[in-house]
Amino acid sequence: MGIKSIVINEQQIEEGCQKAVNWCNAKFNNKKVIVLGILKGCIPFLGKVISKFSFDLQLDFMAVASYHGSHVQKQPPKIVLDMSHDPKDKDILLIEDIVDSGRSIKLVIDLLKTRHAKSITLISLIEKIKPKAFDINIDFSCFKVKDNFLVGFGLDYDGFYRNLPYVGVFEPDNP
């Protein structure tokens, strides 16, 4: 499969997701929030946390394309699916699978700012430990990991491996 090693196992994912739920429930207590999942990678993470959120929410999605069938970001990211709710004067909770360079999520945050969102909060399953190309404030991350190419639990290589119940280091030359 090309998986060199597992860096976050199933039990760790469960624990990290519960910590994210606790943090969000405390932050958004008695608020109405648009939970904005960034497709496609957010699906497993969002699925684990959304049913445990205790605040009022509307669910929405955006899709940002940046890798285009490789593990190297070759082109500037672009919005390929926009959200359906109007973010104006709303609290937005962004759900992201991974923050790597910050390019893709910065595009989303900048767009939400131009649309006059009341507040923008970013939680991510994974944050890579490396300098970000852009100044991004990650309000909560479940895991901070070294700069490897990762797959599993929403993270993919050319659309594959998202369904793995863990996160692993991927090497294309390691079948």
UniProtKB/Swiss-Prot annotation:
Principal location: cytoplasm
Residues annotated as binding GMP: K128, F149, L150, D156
Reactions that this protein is recorded to catalyse: IMP + diphosphate = hypoxanthine + 5-phospho-alpha-D-ribose 1-diphosphate; GMP + diphosphate = guanine + 5-phospho-alpha-D-ribose 1-diphosphate
Organism: Mycoplasma genitalium (strain ATCC 33530 / DSM 19775 / NCTC 10195 / G37)
Physiological role: Purine salvage pathway enzyme that catalyzes the transfer of the ribosyl-5-phosphate group from 5-phospho-alpha-D-ribose 1-diphosphate (PRPP) to the N9 position of the 6-oxopurines hypoxanthine and guanine to form the corresponding ribonucleotides IMP (inosine 5'-monophosphate) and GMP (guanosine 5'-monophosphate), with the release of PPi.
One Gene Ontology cellular component annotation held by this UniProt entry: cytosol
Gene name, Swiss-Prot/TrEMBL: hpt
SUPFAM superfamilies tied to this protein: PRTase-like
Subcellular location: Cytoplasm
Name listed for the protein in its UniProt record: Hypoxanthine-guanine phosphoribosyltransferase
Key words, A-Z: Cytoplasm, Glycosyltransferase, Magnesium, Metal-binding, Nucleotide-binding, Purine salvage, Transferase
Pathway in which the depicted protein is active: Purine metabolism; IMP biosynthesis via salvage pathway; IMP from hypoxanthine: step 1/1; Purine metabolism; GMP biosynthesis via salvage pathway; GMP from guanine: step 1/1
